[in-house]
A protein has these predicted regions:
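Noncatalytic scaffold domains of N-terminal-nucleophile
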Residues: 1-53, 58-111, 170, 181-186
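Protein kinase glycine-rich loop
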Residues: 118
Length: 221
């Protein structure tokens, strides 16, 4: 219901192209954090301290207390105020790949970044410009690449502090094997099987066999 309040402001099925979406609660949160920074700057403190004040306003202020109340009411207190207040970020080494001459850096497995790496590595095997922007073939390739990347991400990705992610997952060689599963004449009917990056196999032997594409994927050329 709390999501419907925002996404279905005009009623279910009544959102149209150009509908104005107003997230008042998010606006209040951002202003709350801005006010904390301004109070810090008004005291003559440097901007770095002001930024920390905005951060603490979120993790140690009323928003954190609201998170605590919500989880106690709906999710048996799985996240608490103490969890919020005790959280501290850290510096991470970014993931890296290349795409047609460009260097691409993303955050690690706790973010959406690795999915981008997987997708770009597969897309590099296709000449998207030759396919033509937004043509049926162009959209088909991108949609199939997204499906393959999401299948692998559901199997292998997670916070690297708690999940061992095979380093081979991000290699170009593995992406090439996965891209071979794409049939230009038929789309995946369901989520495709996850692969086996450690052994450079397009499909892992333990993956579900509900794969409904061609029984034998055409060799990628």
């Amino acid at each position: 219901p709390y999501n419907a309040k925002y996404w279905l402001q005009n009623g279910a099925g009544r959102q149209t192209l150009g509908s104005l979406m107003v997230n008042e609660d998010l606006g209040k949160l951002i202003r709350y954090m801005i006010d904390a920074e301004r109070k810090s700057l008004a005291k003559g403190e440097p901007r770095e301290i002001g930024i920390w004040a905005a951060r603490d306003a979120f993790y140690k202020g009323e928003p954190a207390k609201a998170v605590d109340r919500f989880f106690k009411e709906h999710l048996d207190g799985q996240m608490t105020y103490e969890d919020m207040a005790g959280y501290g970020g850290k510096w991470d080494t970014p993931l890296h790949t290349t795409y047609r001459g460009y260097d691409v850096y993303t955050c690690d497995g706790w973010s959406q970044g690795p999915r981008l790496i997987l997708m770009l590595n597969m897309l590099e095997n296709y000449d998207l410009q030759l396919l033509g922007y937004n043509t049926a073939e162009y959209i088909h390739v991108i949609s199939q690449v997204i499906n393959l990347a999401m299948s692998d991400s559901h199997k292998y990705l997670g916070d690297p502090d708690f999940v061992d992610i095979p380093e081979e997952l991000y290699t170009k060689a593995y992406a090439r094997e996965r891209a071979k599963l794409i049939d230009m004449d038929e789309a995946f009917q369901d989520m495709p099987p996850w692969g086996d990056p450690v052994h450079m196999k397009a499909i892992h032997p333990d993956s579900p066999t509900s794969f409904t594409g061609r029984e034998t994927a055409k060799e990628w050329k």
